[in-house]
Design a protein with these regions (language model features):
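Short beta-strand
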Residues: 99-102
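Short acidic/glycine-enriched loop/turn segments that link adjacent beta-strands
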Residues: 104-107
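Glyoxalase I/VOC metalloenzyme domain signal
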Residues: 1-16, 29-96, 112-159
């Protein structure tokens, strides 16, 4: 697993896993077809790292860049207080909205900024419950040592 490699190599982690994530509302390039994806979230210093695995061949922002078995840097994520304003700002600059979703009580969108930086830009709302969750993960990272178990359950117990 990449998470284990990053943990051993850089001290990243622990990682919180979300398997086969489903959104409440989803749109990818004007379709509602949602790919089957799993996520692992963790910190390396002050930087959140997100590993994403797509389990199927549904067209997606991930398959836009990587075929099955390929890996690489996919997006930069930005937490925003005014989601609609930030989305509008990117659209007015001429960037395409590749994907928009609503999950876990928060809006997120992926803007196709590859022409500028080679990757997508994710904008993500910053409600208190999300900031609290990210803060818990960051605190777990601050206590984390290379060689520790690299998985963190949602209730913050190391596994």
């Amino acid at each position: 697993l990449l998470q284990k490699k990053w943990s051993d190599l850089y001290g990243a982690g622990p990682f919180v896993f979300t398997h086969h994530h489903k959104t409440d509302k989803f749109e990818y390039r004007n379709t509602s077809d949602e790919a089957d994806v799993s996520y692992a979230f963790g910190y390396l210093g002050d930087t959140m790292i997100q590993f994403i695995e797509q389990h199927d061949e549904t067209p997606s922002i991930y398959r836009d860049m990587f075929a099955r078995g390929e890996e690489g840097f996919h997006h930069i994520g930005i937490l925003v207080s005014d989601f609609e304003e930030e989305l509008d700002r990117f659209l007015k600059m001429g960037f395409d909205l590749a994907c928009r979703l609503w999950a876990d009580g928060v809006d997120a969108a992926y803007i196709d900024t590859r022409s500028v930086n080679g990757v997508f830009t994710e904008i993500h709302g910053d409600p208190n419950h999300i900031l609290g969750e990210f803060s818990r993960w960051k605190r777990a990272h601050e206590k984390f040592k290379v060689g520790d178990t690299y998985k963190l359950e949602r209730n913050n117990k190391l596994t």
